[in-house]
A protein has these predicted regions:
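Short, acidic/polar
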Residues: 26-39, 88-95, 152-163
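C-terminal helical cap(s) of enzyme catalytic domains, especially alpha/beta-barrels
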Residues: 112-120, 177-214
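Substrate-binding cleft of secreted/luminal carbohydrate-active enzymes
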Residues: 163-185
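Internal, glycine-rich beta/alpha segment that forms the wall or movable "lid"
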Residues: 2-14, 85-150, 155-157
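N-terminal beta1-alpha1-beta2 module of alpha/beta enzyme domains
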Residues: 1-70, 115-119, 175, 210
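Hydrophobic residues within beta-strands of alpha/beta enzymes
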Residues: 47, 75, 104-106, 171-174
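Structural motif corresponding to the early beta-alpha repeats
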Residues: 74-85
Length: 214
């Protein structure tokens, strides 16, 4: 094989690309993402994500977060050695839980909810009610039911009030301009509470207060 010809006189040498070996994900993922975004904005050619042979977090989930936080650098992910599928899923879920600040929940049918509970017991799983009925059941909270997009603020208030009266915990509404406008107007921020029966402790307290005042 012939050698590459030497660069012509006066030609600039080829630029050396810079890859940044990222630190391990700390307890404050927002700071980590901000640091990664800073390297990207500063001109790094690649962000190198290597969690070692047995990483504490799922590197592909971290790469997804990096893809949203950065815009130009190549994302180089060192995949760990093969591990059981359940362990991969548990690690991925734990990573998203950390990145989201604990906001992650799952949705599945009853059988799948049981499986997910064994893999990730700290992640709540919304149980799909069909064919028993539309919507989902949130553990420890209540039922989420589908609802149509609001025709306007008044219709949205009526829908929220009706859901509260029926004991519905939440509504699942298709994305759209009407819903966006209702949310921007703060209509959904109005307090729509479900009727609750007084608890035994509350009844006892009320009776004690009445006796003291009499």
């Amino acid at each position: 094989m012939s050698a590459s010809p030497p660069p012509s006189a006066g030609a600039a040498p080829p630029a050396v690309r810079v890859g940044v070996l990222l630190p391990r994900l700390p307890e404050e993922p927002a700071d980590w993402l901000a640091e990664c975004a800073a390297y990207d904005s500063a001109g790094a050619d690649a962000l190198w994500l290597d969690g070692g042979p047995d990483p504490a977090h799922d590197v592909l989930a971290l790469a997804a977060a990096l893809a949203a936080a950065t815009g130009r650098a190549r994302l180089v992910v060192a995949l760990p050695d093969s591990v059981p599928q359940a362990a991969l899923l548990a690690r991925a879920l734990a990573t998203v839980v950390l990145l989201s600040g604990g906001r992650l929940a799952l949705a599945a049918d009853s059988r799948r909810c049981a499986e997910l509970g064994a893999v990730a017991p700290t992640v709540p799983a919304f149980r799909r009610l069909a064919p028993a009925g539309p919507g989902y059941e949130e553990p420890g909270a209540g039922r989420w039911t589908p609802a149509a997009a609001p025709a306007g603020p008044d219709a949205w208030r009526t829908a929220l009030a009706g859901a509260a009266e029926r004991g519905v915990h939440g509504l699942v509404v298709p994305a759209g301009q009407r819903l966006l406008e209702a949310l921007r107007l703060g209509v959904s921020a109005e307090r729509h509470t479900r009727p609750n029966r007084p608890t035994r402790a509350r009844v006892t307290t009320e009776r004690q207060t009445t006796r003291r005042s009499s």
